[in-house]
C-alpha cells in the first residue's frame, strides 16, 4: 500500500555464442533482451526487508540484524543471497519494501534468476549502485551458488548488470575484461524462439557437466580448460573418459568459435556468424548433450 521511492530494472539475456564456457574461464557473447525484471522499492527504518512478487503468492521478510539463511519461499532465496553478499561487501543496508514484476520467462534459459538477483541488488542500493559492475555481478553469482545451489558462471549476472541496447557483451571470464560489440545493423534481426521446454539449473545436470570439465582440465594438466588447447586434448585422449573428452572438446571449440564470431560481426559477415552459431548448437547437442528434440527442430527449420 506504500508509494515506491524508485524503480530499477535488470534485463534477461540470450547468449549468442559461448555456451558453457564461462565456468571454464572462456569467452562468452551474451546480449540483453527487452524482457526484464522490474523492482519497485521504498525504504523502511526498522531493518526489515519485505519481498513480494507478481509471480508468486508467497512473500518473504528478512531481518538485516539477524543471520541471513535460506528459507521459504524458495524464490526469495535469490534475494536473500544478494542481501547477504551486499552485507559481506560492507554495503550499509536499510530496511526496504521491494515489489518485483518480471517478463522474463521462468526456466526458459533467459536468466530470470540473474535478473532477479541484479534487480534486488540495485533496489537495495537505492537504485544507484555503489559497486563497480563486476563486483555486483560476482555478489549476485555467489548468491546463486550459496542460496540457490547452482554453481553458475559469471555470464548471466554480468550481462544483466552491463547490458547496453544494440550491443552484445564479449566477456573474458578469466580476467573479467569486457568489450561492447555493436549488434545493431538494421539488416539484422535476432529471433528468440521459446521451445516451451523448461529447465532447472539446480537439477544436478549443470553441476555434473561443470565437474566433468574440471576433471578433464585436471587430467590435461591445466587449471581450467581455457588454459589448454585442442592438440593437448587429442594427445591425452586415452587418459579421459569419453564423456570428459567430449565435454572438453566442446569447450575448447566453443571458445574459438566465440572469438571467430566476434571477428565475423566486426566484418559484417553475418553468414559466417550464422554458421558458427549452428556449429555451436551441433557441439552442444552432440558433445555436451544439452539440447532437446524441440530445440533441434527449431535449428533445423532456421537452417
Region roles according to the model:
Residues 2-13, 38-72, 167-303:
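C-terminal nucleotide
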Amino acid at each position: 500500500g506504500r508509494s515506491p521511492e524508485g524503480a530499477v530494472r535488470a534485463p534477461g539475456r540470450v547468449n549468442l555464442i559461448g555456451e558453457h564456457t564461462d565456468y571454464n574461464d572462456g569467452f562468452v557473447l551474451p546480449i540483453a533482451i527487452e524482457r526484464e525484471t522490474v523492482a519497485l522499492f521504498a525504504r523502511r527504518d526498522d531493518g526489515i526487508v519485505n519481498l513480494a512478487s507478481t509471480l508468486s503468492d508467497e512473500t518473504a521478510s528478512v531481518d538485516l540484524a539477524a543471520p541471513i539463511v535460506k528459507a521459504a519461499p524458495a524464490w526469495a532465496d535469490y534475494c536473500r543471497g544478494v542481501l547477504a553478499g551486499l552485507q559481506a561487501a560492507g554495503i550499509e543496508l536499510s530496511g526496504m519494501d521491494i515489489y518485483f514484476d518480471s517478463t522474463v520467462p521462468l526456466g526458459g534459459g533467459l536468466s530470470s534468476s540473474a535478473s532477479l538477483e541484479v534487480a534486488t541488488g540495485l533496489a537495495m542500493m537505492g537504485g544507484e549502485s555503489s559497486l563497480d559492475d563486476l563486483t555486483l555481478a560476482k555478489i549476485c553469482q555467489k548468491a546463486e551458488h550459496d542460496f540457490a545451489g547452482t554453481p553458475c558462471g559469471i555470464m548471466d549476472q554480468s550481462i544483466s548488470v552491463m547490458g547496453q541496447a544494440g550491443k552484445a557483451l564479449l566477456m573474458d571470464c578469466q580476467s573479467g575484461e569486457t568489450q561492447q560489440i555493436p549488434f545493431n545493423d538494421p539488416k539484422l534481426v535476432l529471433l528468440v524462439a521459446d521451445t516451451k521446454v523448461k529447465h532447472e539449473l539446480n537439477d544436478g545436470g549443470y553441476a555434473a557437466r561443470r565437474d566433468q570439465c574440471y576433471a578433464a582440465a585436471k587430467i590435461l594438466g591445466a587449471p581450467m580448460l581455457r588454459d589448454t588447447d585442442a592438440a593437448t586434448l587429442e594427445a591425452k585422449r586415452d587418459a579421459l573418459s569419453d564423456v570428459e573428452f567430449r565435454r572438453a572438446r566442446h569447450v575448447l571449440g566453443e571458445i574459438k568459435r566465440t572469438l571467430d564470431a566476434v571477428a565475423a560481426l566486426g566484418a559484417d559477415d553475418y553468414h559466417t556468424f550464422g554458421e558458427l552459431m549452428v556449429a555451436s548448437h551441433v557441439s552442444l547437442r552432440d558433445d555436451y548433450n544439452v539440447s532437446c528434440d524441440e530445440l533441434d527442430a527449431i535449428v533445423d527449420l532456421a537452417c
